[in-house]
Amino acid sequence: MSALLKPLDNRLFWPAVAIGGLLILAFVLYLQHVRGFAPCSLCIFIRLDVLGLVLAGIVGSLAPRSRIAGGIAALGMLAASLGGIYHAWSLVAEEKLAAQGMGSCKMFMGFPEWIPLDTWLPQVFQPEGLCGEVVWTLLGQSMAVWSLALFVFCLLVLAAKLAFGRRTA
């Protein structure tokens, strides 16, 4: 059983969360800038949720033995996972509506004036595509479905860490 719990060790877990999130962000930026797939506004929100996972992983990695850092990281991962589930689920619904000839999507993000990410980094945070348009699939499933699966997986892994990984460090 201890071999199964080893990945939940704080020294491995939080860096893996951060690196995994960075790899996902690198992949979607590759799809956008190399393959030419324009992100929609919900895609941008999903990017922010993945960025939340990265930040949670960094916080947890900075002080792997600190209960405070671990608690903040766990709350960050929980918030990012729940936000990601909400946004990915919304995008799956948009894709289904678009397949029926309906759906709507806003082309502006509405970031607060004090942190206008779409102005500061438009190449990353500026929506340019339509939400219901499926431009990439893997095994017959859209990126929205895979994003939903990723965030559900993150939530389950966090639950396992909190339930079983208390003293694995």
From Swiss-Prot:
Cited InterPro entries: DiS_bond_form_DsbB/BdbC, Disulphide_bond_form_DsbB, DsbB, DsbB-like_sf
Keywords: Cell inner membrane, Cell membrane, Chaperone, Disulfide bond, Electron transport, Membrane, Oxidoreductase, Redox-active center, Transmembrane, Transmembrane helix, Transport
Gene (UniProt): dsbB2
Top-level division of the source organism's lineage: Bacteria
Organism: Pseudomonas aeruginosa (strain ATCC 15692 / DSM 22644 / CIP 104116 / JCM 14847 / LMG 12228 / 1C / PRS 101 / PAO1)
Entry similarity comment: Belongs to the DsbB family.
BP GO annotations: protein folding
Lineage: Bacteria, Pseudomonadati, Pseudomonadota, Gammaproteobacteria, Pseudomonadales
Membrane topology qualifier: Multi-pass membrane protein
Residue numbers on the Cytoplasmic membrane side: 1-13, 65-71, 165-169
Bilayer-spanning residue ranges: 14-30, 49-64, 72-89, 146-164
Localisation: Cell inner membrane
Role summary: Required for disulfide bond formation in some periplasmic proteins. Acts by oxidizing the DsbA protein.
Record has Signal as a keyword: no
An example Gene Ontology CC term for this record: plasma membrane
Gene Ontology MF annotations: electron transfer activity; protein-disulfide reductase activity
Full protein name: Disulfide bond formation protein B 2
Disulphide bonds in the chain: 40-43, 105-131
Keyword Transmembrane carried by entry: yes
Residue intervals on the Periplasmic side: 31-48, 90-145
